[in-house]
Amino acid sequence: MKLYSFFNSSASYRVRIALALKGIDYQSVGVNIRIGQQNALEYRRLNPVGLVPTLITDDGESLGQSLAIADWLDRHYPQTLLLPQDDSARMRVLEIVYAIACDIHPINNMRVLRYLGDELIILLAGNGILSLLIELQRNIQQ
């Protein structure tokens, strides 16, 4: 199994954490998105969207999107599950996972930040991300 990822990508972190929790051996391949390596033809053959992470399975299948990869890992390596089996606990975990992946990640994404000036970045970080994290913390503490 081979994981193409950027060291500082939160989506890549999610997959590396999932692989570590499951104790799965894999080869790590760095993709430096700061210099545009995700746009190289060789990488685009693996992931036509040009995002990290990309997991290449032992069967040669190319998987993208961190949550889809985590789901695939849970289905193919069920010995250690990433999500609780209890429906209520599972839903609470998924609420947090989706809040991070769908609400926080997009406004802290390098592709988005490149187009914003410093003033907007500070506004997003100060108001958007911080308020979402505070709400998540409240949700977790309940």
Regions found by a protein language model. Give the residues of each.
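Amphipathic alpha-helical packing segments from all-alpha helical-bundle domains
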Residues: A125-Q142
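GST-like domain detector, emphasizing the conserved glutathione-binding G-site
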Residues: M1-L124
